[in-house]
């Protein structure tokens, strides 16, 4: 009977995808026993309750979620609060037939076909609401039938927000109707008509409730203000000491005057006043402001920690303490397609973790489009290896909800291009979940996808900068081959951190050595790998392009140029031990090769190196960024050659850097 709350999200309809996963967990728990099932479910009897406004049902993810719920037959009850408007826009301009329940009739279950149950009820009719929700609850809990309760004739007493009255867009007749059908008024009428209480009793309850709320509000605000006012007093004490020593400096007086006038200060008001004061104090060398600076820095750090902590589940210290399990090979290892390594590694993980679920488009019956899950549905069953429809936002939503309820889901987004369909849910919900709940809720969802270079305009892009900037809070992992990808999956299964693993799309048929400890060896996010040591220049890259970098580095050696090749491996986190700095400190030259657009991931990489690793003063030449073109890759081999960094582009870029430093040894070509 425990009630749980999943952190909400404000963007309209964004709660819907996760709701699918929360409800699906109950269905799975009813049919699949795992080691820790009892911690998360009572035989799948839990209902996932959700709410949405009538106007938000026009969002695509609402329809996607409704369709998914009907297909999956999950215990989800969604309430649609309908007041006829979406801010100022009437239902006739929002919804077909001016009614979401009428619009969705095709989804409604029949005697012969499963679907949703759709119930329509008036929001001011108390007894009808009880009947409606009792029926909805019974259907969902007992039979795992999704239900939509369309609650109509609701009112909007104050309009959508404080930015403007609803009198601007509602007719006089509508406003009058709302006064008569206000839910509180109708509830009062029902209580009086049934003799439950008299008018005086209700008036007293209403009066006392208002007093209680006002008192509690003031009490909460005073408690919140206490530590802030204490810090302001500390600032005043410093000020009183400084004002005499600065001959009553007028600028210092103005700073205090402004702060005193603020009757309800925030921390930023105090800290801002203190920071401004530092510049005034710097003009008086006789003043010892060490204690003041220490107090200011401590307070600033304390508040920054409160505001900025828990974006990720773990900090750097935690990762540094984790021991990795190294790769192991037989003396004469088999040479196999990369897909075999990823497939057999998933098989090992599924055997090891009974709460691991893998789902997505085409992952079940055919074992994914590149055969990385071949035969695993047959071995582990349809509950654990599941095909889904083409609906990326709710695939991610399933993963978030399932992860919140104790499963370890790997949700497959078939191609990196398709991340755009679910980027909003990934950004607004998954990436920010740990942060916005202050680590009280976490969804360790792993997104499996594939991408990078391929010939053609689709399935060949590498929009890494978009992901890096929109998905802070999620690890972005970019392995160069399937052996590395498997090691990252193994590591991620040992921690509680959401991540996206982008397998190289053109690598499934390339040959790799078969490890003998699949499912066990681990590769830690944030650690680079030096693929080739060198002395003259450092080239850093990731993913598919590394093969071209390695090929070019061999040819460059024939021309007397020694290249150090580094695989970044993960963009977030990025080189946590600052090992790239050590390489640049040795070679003093840098080339970043990236198949994202100009100013994309390469700019992020350079920012990390300049600001966090301080490489600038160790460079003998300007860092060079070699990226793809701004457009999508064109079709055919020529399209690939002229759209993405090629072997020749890499060779030329390195040669030109060396020419600038030693034109006699490396004459211009």
Where are each of the predicted segments found?
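Short glycine/serine/threonine-rich phosphate/pyrophosphate-binding segments
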Residues: 15, 19, 57-65, 87, ...
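Alpha-helical segments flanking ligand/cofactor-binding loops in enzyme cores
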Residues: 67, 397-400, 490, 554, ...
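Phosphate/pyrophosphate-binding betaalpha-module
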Residues: 11-13, 17-19, 24-135, 440, ...
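Secondary-structure transition/capping motifs at alpha-helix termini
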Residues: 29-32, 42-43, 69-77, 107-114, ...
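Short beta-strand segments
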Residues: 13, 51-52, 78-82, 150-155, ...
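Short hydrophobic alpha-helical runs that function as membrane-insertion/retention elements
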Residues: 75-80, 118-119, 385-387, 409-412, ...
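Thiamine diphosphate
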Residues: 1-49, 80-498, 502, 505-669, ...
